[in-house]
Amino acid sequence: MGLIWLLLLSLLEPGWPAAGPGARLRRDAGGRGGVYEHLGGAPRRRKLYCATKYHLQLHPSGRVNGSLENSAYSILEITAVEVGIVAIRGLFSGRYLAMNKRGRLYASEHYSAECEFVERIHELGYNTYASRLYRTVSSTPGARRQPSAERLWYVSVNGKGRPRRGFKTRRTQKSSLFLPRVLDHRDHEMVRQLQSGLPRPPGKGVQPRRRRQKQSPDNLEPSHVQASRLGSQLEASAH
């Protein structure tokens, strides 16, 4: 009889909270297939380091590729727009990472549905970013209701630093795995100098063949040009 009472008391003790209809399963970065639970707020400044050893970068021209070197265009702002859905913006290019209906990555000047990606956490701390809008749906009869019949299109950078088309990607491929890296001291110095509006450092640069004119606020270089020039100078000083 005493054993029965002990069992009943153990059932009444507080344990794991019951999952109600609106409860979400929270997982940390080590959780398999987990999602980040933050909503909105300040963007995370990160560099997305692909398992192929390239940093994802967004150019002012709209081009997307990978860089092996320290580049201002690889400094990104990752903002959660919904639970598990993020927008990725280049800090100095001012453009959003986007994927079109053909699976091509590009840097969009304006935010749209093509700029939203599903962020998932995988083992070893790597993340994947899949287009929220586009995916491959099987045409097999009856497969429409099966989640396994859909194949997501992932952000991917191959071993040559070139973006892969979404429909050719897989979640388990190295080219689809990204490690969010915190900015180092060189990145912070680059951000500080560019945001403080310091004059560009002296050195050789591509100059138009015309008469020298006094530099006015209207003739100042755009921030993305300063970013490129400053990145080159920091690389040279590091060596």
From Swiss-Prot:
PROSITE patterns: HBGF_FGF. GO terms for molecular function: fibroblast growth factor receptor binding; growth factor activity. Residues 193-239 are annotated as: Disordered. Residues 1-17 form the signal peptide. SUPFAM superfamilies: Cytokine. The keyword Glycoprotein applies. It is found in: Secreted. Plays an important role in the regulation of embryonic development, cell proliferation, and cell differentiation. Required for normal ear development. This is Fibroblast growth factor 3. The gene is FGF3.
